[in-house]
Amino acid sequence: MEVLMAERINLVFHNKVLDRTAMKRLISRLIDHFGMAYTSHILDQVKTLGFQQATATSISLGIDDLLTIPSKGWLVQDAEQQSFIFEKYHHYGNVHAVEKLRQSIEIWYATSEYLRQEMNLNFRMTDPLNPVHLMYFSGARGNASQVHQLVGMRGLMSDPQGQMIDLPIQSNLREGLSLTEYIISCYGARKGVVDTAVRTSDAGYLTRRLVEVVQHIVVRRTDCGTARGISVSPHNGMMPERMFIQTLIGRVLADDIYIGPRCIATRNQNIGVGLVNRFLNFRAEPILIRTPLTCRSTSWICRLCYGRSPTHGDLVELGEAVGIIAGQSIGEPGTQLTLRTFHTGGVFTGGTAEHVRAPSNGKIRLNEDLVHPTRTRHGYPAFFCSIYLYVTIESQDILHHVKIPPKSFILVQNDQYVESEQVIAESRAGTSTFNYKEKVRKHIYSDSGGEMHWSTNVYHAPEFTYGNVHLLSKTSHLWILLGEPCHSSLVSTSIHRDQDQMSVQSLSVKRRSTSKLSETNDEANQEIASADFSGKKEDRIADFSDVNRSICTDHYNLVYPAILPILDENSSFFSNCLSKRRRNQFIIPLQSIQEHKNELMPCSSISMKTPPNANGIFWANSILAYFDDPRYRRNNSGSTKYGTLEMHSTVKKEDFIKYRGVNEFRQKMKVERFFFIPEEVHILPGSSSIMVRNHSLIGVDTQITLNLRSRVGGLVRVERKKKIIELKIFFGDIYFPGGADNISQHSGVLIPPGTERKTNYKESKKVKSWIDVQRITPSKKKFFVLVRPVVTYEIMDDITSATLFPPDLLQQRDNAQLRVVNYILHGTGKPIRGNYDTSIQLVRTCLVFKRNQDKKSYYSEAARASVVEIRTNYLIRHFLRIDFVKAPISYIGKRNDPLGLGLLADNGLDWTHKNPYSEARIHQNLNQNQGTIHTFLNRNKESQSLSILSSSNCSRMDPANGAKSNNVIQESKKEEYPILKISNSLGPLGTYPPIANCDSLNHLLTHNQILVTNYFKLDNVKPPFQVFKLKYYFIAENWKVCNYNPGSNLRLNVFDFHWNFLHHNSCAETSKIMSLGQFICQNVCIDKTRPPRKSGQVILVQVDSVVIRLAKPYLATPGATVHGLYGETFFGGDTVVTFNYEKSISGDITQGLPKVEQVLEVRSVDSISMNLEGRVEGWSKCITGILGIPWGFFIGAELTIVQSRISLVNKIQKVYRAQGVHIHNRHIEIIVRQITSKVLVSEDGMSNVFSPGELIGLLRAERTGRALEEPIHYRSVFLGITKASLNTQSFISEASFQETARVLSKAALGGRIDWLKGLKENVVLGGVIPAGTGFRGLVDPSKQYKTIPLKTNLFEGGMRDLLVHHRKLFDSFLNTSPS
């Protein structure tokens, strides 16, 4: 006893906390030194000591023991401030949504992690004996993550799809959650008892599947003789030292270990604690160890590959069922995983960037040649360095050198002054390059309604030429110009509110007056609905029930921001007038009714064709408008013909028309005379019962089918086609010619008037009008001739551009003209289908836009058509206007044509605005509760889109110091320009005035100046409409601002409406600060006064102020998908843009058991890295280049299987270690070996042994290939544990697992033999279990200790031993390969 006391005095006292992990190490070392019996005695004493201390301490847990962190308040406040700053950047359009999401996640994750660290310090300093602190710190109950959520903050959560929610839960469970935080928390959190009950059954089922896979794995041999192994090294940075020790202890070396010439460990040596310490001390090379993954046994395992037994320190005994032990070891912690994920489910865990901070104050010096500017993943400007970079910080006394790692972002500029501890760089080089990434799509929704505008960086996807899917070629802004979009209501009610600036015109046929706008909207609606639309011929009023009648366009000018009535398609008024309105068309009555009284052409509207895109782009030789003359209209079916028997001089001309801006040619015939042959046509279903026969004669009102009667009498022709029956009735005369009559040449031809023809009574008569002669042959021997009347149409060219439009007093453009062409719409001899309810148009008068391409022009071939309305007191005039544009994709300065739906009044009608607004009232409109309605092309079939632009959507920038701060700065002009072209600009509320800022109607000139002057004389307009002597600034196409001198020569073009300055001396060029149509971001300094308070588009530029239409910018990255068309109306919540980006799959969003099951069942991930294919190709080329083509392929396949197995083991271990569960790698390796041991025979090489598609063992395939001396083509597959359980060598084991009937019937048909090698099949049949004591009768004792000494090494010397080992296989491969 005294000696023992003396020894205790010499012992070292360790004052450390003994947690669960330390206890495990202590017990393991006690077993190594003292054995099992003495260790159990020591553990009993430790247990007694623990019970005594716990009883004396009397630890209890209460709600007051949950101490919150004092610094949480200002930490959360600081994070909120950073998030608010970044939210402002996003609002300004400086960063896009993905960058904002990344920054928000990292801000809150860093805050949460800092709170976690503060939690430990707070407990140690304030209450070190706190029960919560004792429990989680000792590892007895809970972990740091759970306690952090109790007393810190829950942080970021994931939604059910695994995506991060950028709104963090700032509260902890001690403080309580708000309603929003509770709903977010419920997305990913487990729900206690319910979750435990469900997951417990899942854990049991997982254990059953695991045991089913490996139940036949028993130790049956001492050494399998393999030369393979897994290389483990503690110095490659991939494995911590503690994990390295746990991996090596209990293993067996696969090769000798040398340090220089000295051998410190031999092959097949058991690795203990002492040997591991020697490896660490001597810094040995990578160590090759034997694992179950490399064991050569097919249905069992050897002692050396398994290693030390988990119960004692020696090698595992023969006959031990290590497979069942492995399944139990992995499945048993399943219940613990379920319970442990109660508080951690759904909480985001990730990594942040490593920051490099400045050691002191000073000036930064770096080599700018080694870096290039870029943009960080958070949207900050930075410099990227791909190699190591040394940064020098020059302080007053000393120079500090900071080493920046490669692939880092430098956040400071050269020669910039930095403060101590300021972040100068961030590095993400520590992340693995082979991290799994998933492709994520993030949709950005519109915050408010408005119009979509974009820059020239948007182009159509090739497969979506006519769709609304666009891609971005480079980073640019998308703008939503604010408005209040709304759909037309289902009832014909007014959408205007009180005090809205508007005017309503409705066309009354009988009274020919405009209904006045009443004070209430209901009265106005009643007057509109009661308008008389029953037109009479004597009044020469158009029939509004026809196609394309009463749709009009209204442009809103600067002086009168007024609108026309917007009518709903479903209302009775709208359905009568516009029931058959075609898409992308609108009609403008350009002439009044009185002007057409003395002309042959009846009053009708002209249908304007607008392309489907928002800008209304027309191309050369395209139809701009068309007019349907009622003289060429028929109500019955028939066919048209152009040629005659004797007259073949009919002029034929083919024009190819560009349709909708693409090279789609449609042939239209231009003729002088054509003939229409009427007939009655009925299209019947194939199953109809016809009551008349083919080639029979019927009368009027004859019963054709059960519910159909004929309208005319004549010859019946019945033709049966696929699923329909076409029945025609030809009316005319039947003529039976004699045998000598030569009638064949007159078959199906036209006979002009004056030609003699014979009748059935042998008499000759002269034809008075054109007739159609057609030979009918009902049988081979009989025939007769059908003579039908023909309607002749002479196409008169009486409709010209002068007829449709007022005469042009100014000269036209030399290289552009409008031609009126009559086109026949139907081909010769082709049938025209119609009925008696609707009419058929035979000829269409088209207004074709022609270009003379021989002469040089300042413009490209594209043009844009619109209609301008000029209003003065009581007179309204509409003009067709064509603007030439540069390119179809150049949308800068272009706006969607605002189309109004309603009826236009005549010139003599009363106008609701009796008091014109003065110049002062114009500017006041922006500050009152008044608005203007914009309507757009009806792309939605269900409802009409429109946008209300009110004063709340505009912002006015007044000068800070009076007139001193103008928007333009005068400069002296140095160069001479013969002609300065002034491009069209956007007006304040949607109009298109040709002058940049026009405050009066004097500058809204049309192409008919005399007509405008007459208007002014009629209205006795006084000074507001006289010539002003104010300064006006024009914007040229090069975005230069020019000051116009009214005394200079000014030429105004007819169809162009561009201003051309003929003399350069008459204007002074200035530099622009704000240009019309320019988009301005919020708080961006433009002049010296002050930055704009809101983002928007400049819609009015004046000398002393600027009006901005508010807009919301969205920054989009290359590859993003833009939804919708340019100028399209968006509603709040509509998808504007979709981002496609990659993100790393977060560590454990799916916690616990589901994650383990996902890996073990080998379920595919949602998506992999987009550049993974390139990595694999590069890796394969590298191996092939080093080892040659045949060897490279073989070794590449081998390494792929080995690396995949190791990766699976690491994945499973990662999940368990995250939950604090430690499982030895050997158990997981046995499971992974079984699910990766099968290969699929491919069809490339047909073998006589295996059939294509058969699953066989990997080792069996290799041995068969060596025995047959021919390669077997196969590919490795990963089977899940369920599928692996149904693909074993025992059909009895498979049938007892699941699908019993299928497995047994398939085994009976295939004649399978069960060799009863596993444990389960012997239990089922009542045999001796081949494990434990039953193992001795199964294996010959002489073979138990038979070893195969091999001095080969797989992973040393460039894998030469592998090639030697498979020399026969390689020789056969080389012999069979083509030379």
Curated annotation (Swiss-Prot):
Zn(2+) binds at residues 224, 295, 302, 305. One of its GO terms (molecular function) is metal ion binding. InterPro entries: DNA-dir_RpoC2_beta_pp, RNA_pol_beta''_euk, RNA_pol_Rpb1_3_sf, RNA_pol_Rpb1_4, RNA_pol_Rpb1_5, Rpb1_funnel_sf. Signal peptide: none annotated. GO terms for cellular component: DNA-directed RNA polymerase complex; mitochondrion; plastid. It is found in: Plastid. NCBIfam families: rpoC2_cyan. This is DNA-directed RNA polymerase subunit beta''. It comes from Cuscuta exaltata.
